[in-house]
Design a protein with these regions (language model features):
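Extended, highly charged clamp/arch subdomains and adjacent linkers
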Residues: 1-81, 100, 125-130, 134
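Non-catalytic alpha-helical coupling and interface elements of nucleotide-dependent molecular machines
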Residues: 37, 41, 73, 156, ...
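Conserved helix-loop functional segments at active or binding sites
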Residues: 70-74, 130, 134, 212, ...
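Short hinge/gating elements
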Residues: 10-18, 46-55, 135-142, 184-192, ...
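Phosphate- and other anionic-substrate recognition elements at nucleic-acid/protein interfaces
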Residues: 60-72, 78-81, 90-240
Length: 303
């Protein structure tokens, strides 16, 4: 860098000192060197660095957007009664059963992972078996966080001991803890604690990944590089656009859609989305477009 600056400074002297004057030449040379080394060169360096940083930032945001789109566009597993399993050690594994429309039917906590004993493991197995039998669970969705593998071992043992045909899947739980502590989750599940909300979210993610993930700030889903190193406004706008494109490309099911999902549909305002949310999930068998709240031709053409 110093060699480059010295070479540039020599070029500058030749450009500005056109006539040799032994009295003024040393002063002009010193002035040019000082101006270039102290002001001009650092300014150029900062500008180049900023341009490179901005270019790298744009590339990182594109990676964020591409990864987010792939996550949102995962195919849903519809028509399943799902047992959401939020694994943990000391605080226990939180369970939530949701029906085919995403309505939470039951929640509980079991302690099959360390520190534990045979008595607690047996009690946990009995609880899970009872939930499967009582609600007709057809799929278990296990979060991939802490104690995921230990929970998987217990689930495999349970499935071998019951006559029901139940499958299980490991689900990416990134952002579930952020959602469970959010204002939206508190409004949706006012009587549930953070763990129960997280288990319900893990269950719903396999039923309709897009509908569940739109409730979480895209920057918190963990689909790219360290997001705090980037321009937050630019990143937020880009990821918001990806979510909007995905929602409008796929459309929504009014029977299971939340207000958060409906807000991304073209022509649906937050007011209309909240009106829809007031209708309980169990009372939403919309089979005709005209039954939807505020359903005009223009209003629901993207739904």
């Amino acid at each position: 860098m110093r060699r480059r600056r010295k070479k540039s400074c020599v070029i500058s002297r030749k450009k500005f000192i056109t006539k040799e004057n032994p009295q003024t030449k040393p002063v002009l040379q010193a002035t040019i060197e000082d101006a270039y080394n102290r002001l001009i060169a650092p300014a150029i360096e900062r500008e180049v660095r900023n341009q490179l940083t901005e270019k790298a930032e744009d590339g990182a945001i594109k990676v964020f957007g591409k990864n987010l789109e792939q996550l949102l566009m995962q195919p849903p597993i519809a028509g399943q009664v799902v047992l959401g399993w939020d694994p943990a050690f000391r605080t226990g594994c939180k369970l939530a059963v949701v029906d085919a429309t995403g309505k939470v039917l039951d929640t509980t906590v079991v302690y099959p992972t360390a520190p534990t004993n045979e008595k607690k493991i047996a009690a946990a197995k009995a609880t899970v078996k009872d939930l499967i039998h009582k609600y007709g669970v057809t799929l278990i969705s296990v979060g991939n966080g802490t104690a995921s593998r230990e929970s998987e071992q217990i689930i495999v043992e349970i499935l071998k001991e019951i006559p029901e045909k139940v499958a299980y899947v490991i689900t990416n739980e990134a952002g579930a803890s952020v959602y469970s502590a959010s204002k939206l989750a508190t409004e949706e599940f006012p009587n549930f604690d953070v763990g129960q909300r997280s288990a319900a979210s893990i269950a719903r993610r396999v039923q309709d990944p897009l509908a569940e993930l739109v409730k979480i700030d895209p920057k918190s889903i963990g689909v790219g590089q360290y997001q705090h190193d980037m321009n937050q406004k630019k990143l937020g706008e880009a990821l918001g656009g990806v979510v909007e494109d995905c929602v409008n490309k796929v459309g929504v099911d009014l029977n299971t859609a939340s207000a958060s999902l409906l807000e991304y549909i073209s022509g649906v305002s937050k007011v209309i989305a909240k009106k829809h949310r007031i209708i309980p999930r169990g009372e939403r068998p919309f089979r005709e477009q005209k039954r939807a709240p505020e359903s005009g031709k223009t209003r629901t053409e993207g739904v």
